[in-house]
Amino acid sequence: MDPNLQYWQNNGQSFLSRLGLWSKILDPTLLLSQAEIEEARTLIQNEENTPGKNDKVSNAWLLSLSSVHSDTGAVISPAYRPQVFLPISAPLVVGSLIAHKGIKSAMFWQFVLHTYCAGFNHANRNATATKDNKTTMKQSLLILGAVSYSTVTGALPQIILQRLRLISSLTQTICRSFLPVPLAAGLAAFNILVVRSEEAENGISLFDANGNAVGVSKEAGFKAVKETAISRATLFGTTAALPTFLMALLERAKFVQRNPRLIAPIGSMCTVITFGLMIPVSFSLFPQLGKIKKENLEKEFQSLDGNEELFYHRGL
């Protein structure tokens, strides 16, 4: 078991402990060079020889958790590390949720957002589901299909408004305020389910309480993908819903009615703030090192001696 997973096993089994950890891991200042990351990994691997826990060791753990893949031990591409998820994706989320004058611009923002999310989901997947941890041609085609489908479906409210110009005000309100919420949540979950589908099809590695690999399980793979899909749907669904609700209240305020141009920038600020606050919350909903009871696994695992639960890397 990778040192990162061992750390999560000892420190991330409650929601509050995970939330505290993610709040530190998501610090953009942790975006450091590969040499510094490798130095941090060497330090934590020799932690037993370090006299006590000091700030240097603590920072090394945060750097490892935020920059090194827990299955391969390889350094994650800088664009897909957790600490840059907010700076990169926040503008894309705002662009995907605001009203556009044309269909092309709406589809452009949807395409860029879902392309980045697909890359992030793939880079932070459980990499034990594929041989030599490499991306298969089938998976590449699935990712392309997921991005294409999400681009069109995400722009559906704008397509309806543009193509059906003579529609009631109620329909316009539904398309602009209500429809984007389930679409954002559903497409975020859909992206995870498709991009990481091979984990459920091929299975992922299981570990016992001592960190020893005991086999590969499709049931654990399905559970890992399902939990991450719920996490991502919570993130994007809340980000779409809460600012809409807040803006509906603010639009009644006199100062906003006197200055209608404030609505757009205030709405964008609400979206960014909500998204930023929800990232550590959504990442913390489920443990990075998940547990699954042997009775819920394949028969080959139910006869294993020892603990009643086994562990798996959930991915992000």
Swiss-Prot record:
What's one Pfam family the UniProt record gives for this protein?
SFXNs
Is Glycosyltransferase given among the entry's keywords? no
UniProt subcellular location: Mitochondrion inner membrane
Q: What is its main location?
A: mitochondrion
The terms under GO molecular function for this entry are:
monoatomic ion transmembrane transporter activity; transmembrane transporter activity
- Write out the GO cellular component annotations: mitochondrial inner membrane; mitochondrion
Residue intervals passing through the bilayer: 83-103, 141-161, 174-194, 230-250, 263-283
Q: Which UniProt keywords apply?
A: Amino-acid transport, Membrane, Mitochondrion, Mitochondrion inner membrane, Transmembrane, Transmembrane helix, Transport
One Gene Ontology term of the biological-process aspect is: amino acid transport
Which topology term describes how it sits in the membrane? Answer: Multi-pass membrane protein
Inactivation phenotype: Morpholino knockdown of the protein causes erythroid abnormality and global defects in respiratory-chain activity. Morphant embryos exhibit erythrocytes with enlarged nuclei containing open chromatin, consistent with maturation arrest. The nuclear/cytoplasmic ratio is increased nearly 3-fold. Anemia cannot be rescued neither by exogenous folate or vitamin B12 supplementation, nor by N-acetylcysteine treatment.
UniProt similarity note? Belongs to the sideroflexin family.
Q: What does this protein do?
A: Mitochondrial amino-acid transporter. Does not act as a serine transporter: not able to mediate transport of serine into mitochondria.
Name of the protein in its database record: Sideroflexin-4
The gene designation is sfxn4
